[in-house]
Design a protein with these regions (language model features):
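Glycine-centered flexible beta-alpha turn that most often forms the glycine-rich phosphate-binding loop
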Residues: 222
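N-terminal small-domain helix-loop-helix segment of the aminotransferase-like
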Residues: 5-6, 11-113, 120, 300-304, ...
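Conserved core of the PLP fold type I
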Residues: 67-215, 226-245, 314, 411
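Conserved PLP-binding catalytic core of the aspartate aminotransferase-like
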Residues: 331-366, 381
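Conserved glycine-rich beta-strand-loop-beta hairpin in the small C-terminal domain of fold type I
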Residues: 39-41, 296, 312-322, 333-347, ...
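Helix C-cap/helix->beta junction micro-motif
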Residues: 30, 149, 214-215, 365, ...
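PLP-dependent enzyme catalytic core of the Aspartate aminotransferase-like
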Residues: 89, 382-429
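Conserved core segment of the aminotransferase class I/II
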Residues: 243-315, 323
Length: 429
């Protein structure tokens, strides 16, 4: 068949298929690739669905069919008020965020997952060539959307405690000197970063917020893994230190802590929120009413009793992976997550190509992970702290693996990681 001869949008040539989406075609025994939730509060969902079904039947038999019709209809673009109230209460009580008990719910915006929030935020903030500061490595679902909107990425290296505010400050100054303009925003995952697994200590959280305020940048805090903290102290999010809510764009999601309902709940400065609501109206009109209602019942009735079981499940999976890496991998360096889904491991040899090894050795042996180079910008710059220069991002490291412990059972994780370690030792010897 011959279709119309038209040219597709330029971004389709700039950005290849997501590496994680690409790897889904492989069916393997040992799956350490995408961060698929494997510990879900399964006992809650039959009760939630039963509760909603009984409520709907009662409405139908009482002649209030219109109430049921509304459950499967369009709703407000910014989310159902009753759902926003539940989320506001949780963020106030669990995160220590300053939200008015009576009116604070109006600041909450519901999106169809955090990924939609990312897309909408960048859609309303970025013009071509606008600069964005991100960690290195960085969540590819954020950085590639920046590229889609023709933004310029500046990736700033961190350490085992996440982003280093001093480096971010210097990178901003260097960008101003080089390009004659400051970046628009900083992106960070403060709790159990994806892909590195690092968690920022409180002093760095405060310092990073100070940098954003001093330089006049928005700070996008992606808190997808906030409730999946199974070791150490539970720290306040950066948004809790932004008392007037003028700087931090705070994103949370049900996907990791409940299930992949595609319900995100967000706080944004008022001027950003209004533009994002407008953009969402043109994007999907509203987040499905029925999934919002499922989330509402879960957080109201089941969240406290199930979240500890969820955390414990992920802790056991993390421990199985960490133990097997420490005992069976070749010499290298790994992060030590306090939560989240991922461990980041770097081979001792800088010339090791983790993508080549994946294709030629790991996949044929039934093992799947995501090569580390997938988490560096396709286009843009990497800040070098030693020289203070911004260098081309195309020369990103190739010797890292992102290993997910979220999906497989602990005994399968241990077995698969020991097998991967044996393959790595043989390959690197």
């Amino acid at each position: 068949l011959t279709g119309p001869m038209v040219e597709f949008s330029a971004w389709t040539r700039l950005i290849p298929e997501s590496e994680i989406r690409r790897l889904l075609k492989y069916k393997v025994k040992y799956y350490f690739a995408g961060g698929k939730p494997g510990v879900l509060p399964l006992g809650a969902f039959p009760m939630i669905l039963n509760t909603l079904a009984l409520q709907e039947l009662e409405s139908i038999f009482s002649g209030r069919e219109v109430e049921v019709i509304e459950d499967y209809n369009y709703g407000p673009t910014d989310g159902l008020p009753e759902v926003r109230k539940v989320m506001a209460n949780m963020m106030r009580e669990r995160d220590g965020i300053n939200l008015d008990p009576e009116e604070g719910w109006k600041e909450v915006l519901i999106t169809t997952g955090s990924q939609q929030a990312i897309h909408l935020i960048l859609d309303v903030l970025l013009n071509p060539d606008d600069l964005v500061i991100v960690p290195a490595p960085v969540y590819l679902g954020f950085v590639n959307v920046v590229t889609k909107f023709r933004g310029q990425v500046i990736a700033v290296p961190g350490d085992k405690q996440g982003m280093i505010p001093e480096y971010v400050d210097k990178a901003i100054d260097r960008a101003i000197n080089k390009f004659g303009r400051k970046p628009k925003l900083i992106y960070v995952v403060a709790d159990s970063d994806n892909p590195s697994g690092t968690t920022m200590p409180e002093n760095r959280r405060r310092d990073l917020l100070d940098v954003a305020k001093d330089k006049g940048l928005y700070l996008v805090e992606d808190a997808a893994y906030r409730e999946i903290q199974f070791r150490g102290e539970r720290l306040k999010p950066i948004r809790a230190f932004d008392d007037d809510g003028s700087t931090v764009i705070y994103m949370r999601t049900t996907s990791k802590e409940v299930a992949v309902l595609r319900v995100g709940y967000n706080l944004m400065p008022p001027e950003v929120r209004e533009e994002v609501i407008k953009a969402k109206g043109y994007n999907d009109l509203c987040t499905p009413t029925i999934t919002q209602k499922i989330a509402k019942v879960y957080y109201e009735k089941y969240f406290p009793q199930f979240i500890e079981k969820v955390r414990e499940g992920y802790r056991k999976r993390y421990e199985a992976m960490a133990k097997a890496i420490d005992e069976d991998f070749p010499d290298g360096e790994r992060t030590d997550p306090t939560g989240g889904f991922f461990i980041w491991w770097e081979a001792p040899r800088k010339d090791f190509d983790s993508k080549k090894f994946l294709e030629e050795v790991a996949i044929p042996n039934d093992v799947l992970y995501v090569p580390g180079q997938a988490f560096y910008p396709l286009k843009g710059y990497i800040f070098h702290p030693e020289s203070g220069d911004l260098v081309d991002a195309s020369n990103s490291p190739t010797n890292a693996l992102r290993l997910s412990y979220s999906y497989m059972e602990p005994e399968v994780i241990e077995e698969g990681i020991r097998k991967l370690g044996s393959l790595l030792k043989e390959y690197l010897s």
